[in-house]
C-alpha cells in the first residue's frame, strides 16, 4: 500500500484533468461576481496542490482540505465556517458536489445543494441525499449559479 501511495503522490496529475467546461464555468461565475471556494475530504496539502495545478488563475476565497481544523464531511462544520466567511446569508450559498456526502454536508450546513451528474455517484443517490437541483453539464451549472445570484 505504501508503494501505491508513493506512486500516486508522484504521478497523480498525469491523467487527471478538470471535467469538460469547468474552467470556463469558473471564469463565467467570477465574471458575474460570484465568490468561489473549495472544500474537500482529501488531505489539505493535496487539495491545495490540485487547485494550484488545475486552476492557478482562479481566485478561490478559501481552499480547505481535510486536516485537524474540521471533521470530515458530511460533518457540516467546515462548510458552515467557509460560508460564514463569505456572507452572513448562508442560504444564498450554493454547495456543488458529486457525492451523497457532499449533499449531506450542504443540507447540514443549510446551503443550497446542487448535485452534478458527471461525478462519482449516480443521480438517484445524490438526489436522495438532499440535492435540490441536479446539473448535467458545466454550462447548466453556470446558468443555475448565475441565476441564483440575482
Model-predicted regions and their roles:
Residues 1-2:
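Short, small-residue-biased leader/transition segments that mark boundaries at the very start
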Residues 117:
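Nucleotide-sugar donor-binding loop of glycosyltransferases
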Residues 142-150:
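Short amphipathic alpha-helix with an adjacent loop that forms part of the alpha/beta core around
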Residues 14-17, 43-96, 100-109, 123-127:
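Substrate-recognition "cap/lid" segment bordering the active-site pocket of phosphatases
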Residues 133-137:
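Short acidic-hydrophobic, aromatic-tinged amphipathic segments that line or gate anion-handling sites
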Residues 10-38, 44-49, 76:
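Short, acidic loop-to-helix structural element flanking the phosphoryl-transfer center
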Amino acid at each position: 500500500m505504501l508503494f501505491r501511495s508513493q506512486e500516486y503522490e508522484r504521478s497523480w496529475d498525469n491523467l487527471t484533468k478538470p471535467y469538460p467546461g469547468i474552467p470556463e464555468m469558473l471564469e463565467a461565475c467570477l465574471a458575474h461576481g460570484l465568490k468561489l471556494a473549495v472544500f474537500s475530504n482529501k488531505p489539505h496539502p493535496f487539495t491545495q496542490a490540485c487547485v494550484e495545478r488545475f486552476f492557478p488563475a482562479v481566485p478561490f476565497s478559501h481552499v480547505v482540505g481535510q486536516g485537524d481544523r474540521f471533521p470530515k464531511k458530511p460533518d457540516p462544520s467546515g462548510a458552515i465556517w467557509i460560508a460564514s466567511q463569505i456572507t452572513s446569508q448562508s442560504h444564498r450559498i450554493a454547495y456543488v458536489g458529486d457525492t451523497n456526502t457532499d449533499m449531506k454536508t450542504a443540507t447540514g450546513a443549510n446551503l443550497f445543494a446542487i448535485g452534478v451528474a458527471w461525478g462519482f455517484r449516480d443521480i438517484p443517490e445524490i438526489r436522495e441525499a438532499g440535492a435540490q437541483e441536479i446539473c448535467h453539464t458545466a454550462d447548466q451549472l453556470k446558468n443555475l449559479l448565475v441565476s441564483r445570484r440575482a
